[in-house]
Amino acid sequence: MVKVVKNFVKVNQYTRPGLKLAGVKGIVMHYTATPGASALNERDYFNGTCIAIKRKASSAHYFVDRKEAQHIIPENEVAYHAHDKNRCYVSFLKPNANTKSISVEMCVEKDGMIHSETVQNAAELVADLCKRYGLSTNKIVRHYDVTNKICPAPWVSDSSQLTTFRKKVDSLLGNKTVSKTTSSTSQSSKSTGTILKKGASGSQVKALQKRLIAAGFSLPKYGADGSYENETVQAVKALQKKAGIAVDGIYGPATEKALAAIGAKKKKPSSNGKKTSYPLPSGIYKVKSPLMKGTGVRQIQEALAALYFYPDKGAKNNGIDGYYGPKTANAVKRFQLMHGLSADGIYGSDTKAKLKTLLK
């Protein structure tokens, strides 16, 4: 078990407000994004500079490095870690993840990467938390899942790292895990006898969600987020009702057969659930006064949304409104970060080219 050092920061309005949690419903994983800083360095920052100079509402319960875990906020208190812009896209943490979760920050090395020893220490800590609070590993989520912030960045650019981490925690807990990875997500895939139901998560759930959307069973709030929660249950029930089969919200062979039949009748969507084409404007689009607006902006927003970079996920039409405001710029910036482009939130030729490549 990783060495845990209890080293609470002082109660203050910015990093430790002293508010009580409403319960522990999940674990939110983060990374520090401060190359070379140790867990103790982070603890001292949130007990000093962040309060006296930055005056920024930010913190986490635990900071983990290759050596130890610094426990800086009591587990029964709120840490300010995952409520950016009042967002919460994880149903079991709504309406505010800060009040229902414990946060774990992984320190990064000088090269900006998370060391395997740090990941192992984090897994040991999280396994202990899951055991004590009766949490299954599908309650371990990324900051990105909660608010769409690119954190932990290595786990956003490669989502399989979260799956691997969950399996590691399952192993530490002595649980047997079943792989949920499939070799194909096309509409024409054959039934494998897979059963998916509420609480499941991963790439196979995300593939199912994409197929549901393509077949006309919308997921307006969360889209294809890889979590089999109430919205997906209702979409599956709607499919089952339409197909005249047992309505239980559980995806199995009969539901797969029904979905494949409906998908085969769909002529307009492609096999991955996207529109056949996304026209994109030329030129430069950025935030300016007055805001840029019109068809070109809407085309950019629709293309980003097709790749799950929503201007304002959960809002009306997921923020696709034809105005190039801060939220659209943020969606562009997130897209650029994920695909190795200069992350300035400005749409130009490079961003257009990358969008076109991914939407082919």
UniProtKB/Swiss-Prot annotation:
Keyword Signal attached: yes
Gene Ontology molecular functions: N-acetylmuramoyl-L-alanine amidase activity
One GO cellular component, as annotated: extracellular region
SMART domains found in the cross-reference section: Ami_2 (SM00644)
N-acetylmuramoyl-L-alanine amidase domain span: 40-154
SUPFAM superfamilies noted in UniProt: N-acetylmuramoyl-L-alanine amidase-like, PGBD-like
Gene3D superfamilies: Peptidoglycan recognition protein-like, PGBD-like superfamily/PGBD
Location, primary (coarse class): secreted
Region called 2 X approximate repeats, residue ranges: 166-289, 196-355
Name this polypeptide is given: N-acetylmuramoyl-L-alanine amidase CwlL
Species lineage: Bacteria, Bacillati, Bacillota, Bacilli, Bacillales
